[in-house]
C-alpha cells in the first residue's frame, strides 16, 4: 500500500517493507463533508487507518506526520486550525512531539492518547480490541 505525501513522495507499507519513496513529508487528508476547524494528528498511516476504522475521525481533517521528524513541516499546515487533536505514540518521541505542538499552539492542542491507554499507539489498541471481540464472539458461540 502506498500513501501520497504533500511533497509528492509515498509512504509504502507491506508485510515485508516499511519505508518511503522520497521525498519524505507529511500527508493531509481533508474532510469530504465541510471545511473543518479541527485537525487530528497521527504519527503514521496505520494509526490514521486505525482511527478511521474505530470511527474517531468524525468530520476533522487528518494530518499524518509519517515521522515525528516532520513536526516542523506539519506546523505551517496546522496554523489555520482552531483545534488540534493528537493521537501520537505513547513513547518518548510521541511526548516530545506533543510538547512541541503544545508549545506552539497552546490550548488548541489536545492529547487524545488516553483512548489507547496501556497500548503503544492507536493501531495496537485496535488490534487488541479486535482480538478481544473475536475471542468474546467465539466464547458466545461455544455456549
Predicted regions, residues:
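TOPRIM fold recognition
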Residues: 37, 53-143
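Phosphate-handling DNA/RNA-contact segment within nucleic-acid enzymes
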Residues: 1-79
Amino acid at each position: 500500500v502506498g500513501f501520497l505525501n504533500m511533497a509528492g513522495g509515498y509512504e509504502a507499507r507491506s508485510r515485508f517493507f516499511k519505508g518511503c519513496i522520497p521525498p519524505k513529508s507529511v500527508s493531509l487528508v481533508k474532510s469530504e463533508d465541510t471545511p473543518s476547524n479541527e485537525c487530528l494528528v497521527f504519527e503514521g498511516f496505520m494509526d490514521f487507518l486505525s482511527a478511521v476504522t474505530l470511527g474517531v475521525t468524525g468530520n476533522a481533517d487528518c494530518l499524518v506526520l509519517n515521522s515525528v521528524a516532520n513536526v516542523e513541516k506539519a506546523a505551517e499546515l496546522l496554523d489555520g486550525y482552531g483545534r488540534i487533536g493528537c493521537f501520537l505514540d505513547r513513547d518518548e518521541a510521541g511526548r516530545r512531539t506533543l510538547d512541541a505542538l503544545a508549545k506552539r499552539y497552546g490550548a488548541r492542542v489536545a492529547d487524545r492518547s488516553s483512548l489507547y491507554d496501556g497500548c503503544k499507539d492507536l493501531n495496537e489498541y485496535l488490534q487488541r480490541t479486535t482480538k478481544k471481540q473475536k475471542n468474546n464472539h467465539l466464547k458466545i458461540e461455544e455456549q
